[in-house]
């Protein structure tokens, strides 16, 4: 468990018995259950079949029962339980078609997108892959250097970090609206083949999904993962 920024941690889960591990795809989600039974869903950021562990990106949520436990009480090596995996937000291309892929997310919405991008590149996807990750301020972003390096190794992969304010002189970050940037990146010549993955807060996901659909992307080509915040019960 290590920090990705001031409010997000990377949690690595290794099963006690790999023979009983469920199948999963990068971008799907699982249910994480702590020793007292508190359960939350988190997206998978890596390929378990290759790495032998699961990687989750978890934001510290105000009044969040599970995140309070993770950030303040959990110790390395402590046992947790998982159920899953579920969801259709993952890379699929059984026919090896060179369709373009657009990945758009905010906050820990990067987790499934990071997994999907790596999965597509491992499968030698031939179409362009564009990933837009947004935050309100630069401190909300993470994995910028890793994604820039990935882009330098794969000419067909393009990455852009965006913030609403505070970009300053950091050349890794663009100040602007992530929805507008994503919409403007869509090529009318390939819109019929485009696959879009949107992850983040529900209002962001639902709003951008509608805009992308109205722009002409097929509904069946849009995959979404909306992250719902759950607060602790009040006494």
Residue ranges and their predicted role:
Residues 1-78, 135-137, 164-166:
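Ferredoxin-reductase
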Residues 27, 109, 201:
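Short, conserved phosphate/pyrophosphate- and ester-handling motifs at nucleotide-, phospho-/glycolipid
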Residues 38-45, 87-95:
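Short, Lys/Arg- and Gly-enriched loop/turn segments at beta-strand edges
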Residues 76-91, 181:
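Helix-loop module immediately N-terminal to the HCX5R catalytic loop
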Residues 100-104, 197:
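Conserved beta-strand elements of the Class I
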Residues 112-122:
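Histidine-anchored nucleotide/phosphate-binding helix
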Residues 128, 132-235:
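Reductase modules of NAD(P)H-dependent flavoproteins
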């Amino acid at each position: 468990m290590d920090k990705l920024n001031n409010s997000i941690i990377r949690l690595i889960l290794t099963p006690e018995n790999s023979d009983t591990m469920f199948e999963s795809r990068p971008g799907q989600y699982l249910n994480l259950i702590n020793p007292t039974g508190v359960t939350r869903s988190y997206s998978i950021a890596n390929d378990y079949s290759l790495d032998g562990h699961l990687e989750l990106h978890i934001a510290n949520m105000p009044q969040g029962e599970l995140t309070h436990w993770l950030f303040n009480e959990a110790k390395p090596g402590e046992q947790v339980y998982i159920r899953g995996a579920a969801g259709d937000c993952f890379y699929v291309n059984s026919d090896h078609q060179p369709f373009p892929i657009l990945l758009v997310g905010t906050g820990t919405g990067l987790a499934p997108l990071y997994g999907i991008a790596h999965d597509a590149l491992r499968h030698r996807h031939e179409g362009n892959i564009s990933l837009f990750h947004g935050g309100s301020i630069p401190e909300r972003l993470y994995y910028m250097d890793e994604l820039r390096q990935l882009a330098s190794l794969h000419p067909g992969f393009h990455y852009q970090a965006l913030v609403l304010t505070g970009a300053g002189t950091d050349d890794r970050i663009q100040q602007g609206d992530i929805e507008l940037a994503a919409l403007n990146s869509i090529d009318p010549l390939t819109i019929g083949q485009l696959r879009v993955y949107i992850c983040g807060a529900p209002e962001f996901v639902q709003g951008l999904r509608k805009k992308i659909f109205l722009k002409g992307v097929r509904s069946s080509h849009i995959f979404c993962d909306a992250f719902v915040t759950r607060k602790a019960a009040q006494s």
